[in-house]
């Protein structure tokens, strides 16, 4: 356990503390968490992190999409039924920003030791307006556009609406993860 005194904050190298708490006008516990996360990210230790307070001050909006990590990237594993033909497509960008850039940017918010950790972090948060708005400051509140490379090698754009977290949870619970349907379930041993 380490304490961080005011003197400790002053002694942290500027490259590791881009915006000190002294310079920021922090008004909520959630904002403080984001600032501390930015401070911890350069440590590149995925086991050093801070969780949000139990009661969050803001409600979250999410896009109806879910991803899975595969071969150094992300593929779509859940989408609304009308876009089901795009399941298995590789994510190549969000709002025109290439995934490689997003991997680097998310590593400034969530500590990770390696490239796989960066990909996994984007996998977990690529549907979250709260996180994506930190990576894409121009992100709108009503919808988001994903750039995908389909299994038959076509690049397409798909625009999805954001929805309240409770509605997203309901949607997510009703969507079967069809990306696993091709995995054999009988006569299989590990």
Predicted features by range, described:
Residues 1-190:
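Flexible, low-complexity junctional segments that flank or bridge functional domains
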């Amino acid at each position: 356990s380490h304490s961080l005194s005011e003197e400790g904050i002053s002694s942290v190298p500027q490259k590791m503390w881009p915006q000190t708490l002294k310079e920021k006008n922090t008004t909520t516990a959630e904002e403080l968490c984001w600032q501390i996360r930015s401070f911890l990210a350069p440590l590149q230790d995925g086991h050093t992190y801070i969780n949000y307070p139990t009661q969050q001050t803001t409600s979250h909006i999410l896009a109806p999409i879910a991803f899975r990590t595969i071969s150094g990237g992300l593929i779509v594993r859940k989408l609304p039924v009308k876009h089901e033909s795009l399941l298995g497509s590789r994510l190549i960008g969000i709002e025109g920003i290439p995934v490689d850039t997003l991997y680097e940017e998310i590593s400034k918010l969530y500590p990770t030791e390696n490239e796989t950790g960066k990909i996994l972090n984007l996998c977990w948060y690529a549907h979250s307006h709260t996180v994506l708005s930190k990576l894409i400051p121009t992100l709108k509140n009503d919808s988001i556009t994903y750039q995908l490379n389909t299994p038959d090698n076509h690049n397409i754009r798909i625009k999805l609406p954001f929805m309240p977290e409770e509605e997203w949870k309901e949607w997510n619970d009703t969507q079967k993860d069809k990306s696993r349907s091709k995995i054999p379930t009988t006569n299989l041993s590990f």
